[in-house]
Amino acid sequence: MTSVPANAIGTGGTYGGVEGEEISAEASQSRIKVTQVSGSTGGKRGTLSSTDLNWEPPPCWYEPLFTPEQLKTFAETNGNGQVSIRQGWIGSELWTDHFRDEKDANNYFGTPSMVKGYKNYNLGKKGYFWHGVAPDVNSIDDTKLCNRLMFWQNAGDIPDDPNAPTPETLADYAYNKVKVPETAVELKPATKSTVNLPTWVWLDKGTFQEVKVRAELPNTGLWAETTAKPVALHLNPGTEDAQTFPASGDCEINADGSIGTPYSTGDADKTPPCGIRYLKATNGTPYRLSASVTWQITWEGAGGTGGDLPDGTFETTQDMNVQEIQAINR
């Protein structure tokens, strides 16, 4: 029997709990269930980048893992797993000593401490043994975070702990699960722009719709829905030798969900509400036009909770070839 750092025994990409007939104790992945409630599910999609570079979701939190019966089965038939987010126990004896035979156990990380043992896995009681979860445990600098040894919580109760999950925890988690469509803008001219003549840019209505993702943590009553709403398209022509329309490069989304205005015959000399004018030809090396949609993020959750999260962006790029104006000899 051995007690080792958790990352020494591997995580294997499975989460703790019961998966089919397999019972495991791993801390690398959450048991949060994520479903997309609304929005596009087809075509090329990607995740959002937060516009707030200082924002990031919590690195870890606690989740219910085992019922008393499940812990008994795991301890007596397996016994290899993570008893905390950083500490692994190899061998059934460590598990049975602490969770069956009331033997106190060492928590080596953070502030070392002794943890009081349990009697017979708390069989007959209603509740769950909770443990720390971190999608990337190696990114956590503070070893005290979420590092309690697996602990008991009565059914229906959330731990009184600063790292206990909340609806906002789930909203933050869902933020990184939101997938939005690529920003494939319509252009006119479509294949090659001309120096000093505007290129019209637009997106038809229906291309971008709200995306809503629901996250639920089983056996807690906690849930949150994170909604991403497209609010603007930003154009970067890929060169300083260009003008954008509007000057900021930010094209607002129209009331019907479209962006910009489609080009019509006779519009060549007009200024587009959303577009670009290149001032210099490419001469063999195309400019890289980037188009990024800004998504406004809000959330609502259990208990009437809700609020705003940082806006997110998703960017795509495409080549732009620009030719000189062709002179006409008379």
Task: Give the ranges of each region predicted by the language model.
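Short tyrosine-centred short linear motifs in exposed loops/low-complexity segments
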Residues: 269-291
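Internal, hydrophobic beta-strand segments that form the core of beta-sheet-rich folds
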Residues: 285-303
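Solvent-exposed N-terminal domain segments of exported/luminal and surface proteins
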Residues: 10-160
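Secretory targeting and sorting signals
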Residues: 1-8
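Exoplasmic/lumenal beta-rich domain surfaces
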Residues: 229-277
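Beta-strand elements of well-folded, non-transmembrane domains
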Residues: 239, 280, 293-299, 320-326
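Extracellular secretory-pathway ectodomains of glycoproteins
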Residues: 145-233
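Short beta-strand elements
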Residues: 301-329
